[in-house]
A protein has these predicted regions:
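Short aromatic-enriched loop/helix-cap "lid" or pocket-rim segments at secondary-structure transitions
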Residues: 42, 69-70, 127-133, 178-183, ...
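Sec-dependent N-terminal signal peptides
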Residues: 8-17
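Sec/Tat signal peptide C-region and signal peptidase I cleavage site
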Residues: 20-24
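The serine-hydrolase catalytic nucleophile loop
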Residues: 37-43
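C-terminal catalytic-base region of ester-bond hydrolases, centering on the histidine
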Residues: 161-242
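Bacterial N-terminal signal peptides that target proteins for export
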Residues: 1-9
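Serine-dependent carboxylesterase/thioesterase catalytic core
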Residues: 26-34, 55-61, 65-164
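A short, Lys/Arg-enriched amphipathic alpha-helix followed by its capping loop at the start of a domain
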Residues: 43-53
Length: 242
């Protein structure tokens, strides 16, 4: 009787294992957006913890400190904690904070492998809301970051590094209703349009019917976050109905 050669099977199994992150030293950082708080991201944090992930619901002074400074603080913290692998879940401006962190990483230094990055409604190409308030009398009261999120091609948001990891993008839409936000010509969540959220290197993009500020609290959004973190994919349907 001819014996089966298991060497090819063992080889491919070894390659598969080597390409998986070391989840014993994998940490997921969760970041709120401009004016947000730990409470806003608490359900996502608890959902990931329930699935066995080591997480940190990371907060920062979004009204007082500029994005570059916050990104540097995050970089220093992650480097000091020295996990093998890190992932991110961000809402709104939190995505820009993580993108700014990339500026401080160089190939010669030891820095954890960045595995997955799930963005909820990120103003990757700015937001018309920032355009409006950047030119208003309220600008001085809103802190340094509003003007950094303008939509013009020379703005700060446009110049940030593009993530090199697996990116999953969740964008909020409400339909093209002029009464929803008169400042925005395209489909939007009240703050960020789909067009301004997209970077172009996403592994997957999915839309949900949600207002901007409520997105991290939605059960279906949390389900999508958990699914992408575990599998690297959302679901087949491109729109999740409430």
């Amino acid at each position: 009787m001819r014996r089966m050669d298991f060497k090819p099977v063992l080889f491919f199994f070894f390659v598969f294992i080597c390409n998986q992150p070391s989840f014993s030293t994998h940490k997921v950082y969760i970041l709120h957006g401009y004016g947000g708080s730990l409470i806003q991201m608490d359900k996502i944090d608890k959902g990931l913890k329930h699935e066995g992930y080591n997480t940190e619901n990371y907060t920062y002074p979004s009204f007082k400190e500029c994005i570059d400074s916050i990104g540097h603080d995050l970089f220093v913290k992650i480097k000091q904690e020295n996990y093998d692998t890190v992932s991110f879940v961000t809402h709104s401006m939190g995505a820009l904070v993580v993108r700014s962190m990339y500026k401080y990483i160089n190939p010669t230094m030891h820095f954890p492998f960045i595995y997955r990055f799930i963005m909820l409604a990120p103003p990757n190409k700015g937001t018309e809301v920032a355009d409006f308030f950047s030119n208003s009398s309220l600008r001085s009261f809103l802190g340094p970051n509003v003007s950094l999120m303008r939509t013009d091609s020379n703005s700060y948001a446009f110049k940030l590094p593009i993530p090199t990891c697996e990116v999953g993008l969740i964008v909020g839409v409400k339909g093209k209703k002029p009464w929803f936000n008169p400042f925005m010509p395209d489909d939007n969540d009240g703050t960020v349009t789909m067009k301004s959220a997209i970077l172009g290197n996403e592994k997957e993009i999915i839309t949900v019917k949600s207002m901007h500020i409520l997105m991290p609290l939605k059960k279906k959004v949390i389900t999508l976050v958990l699914r992408f973190m575990k599998t690297g994919t959302f679901i087949k349907n491109s729109i999740i109905n409430n």
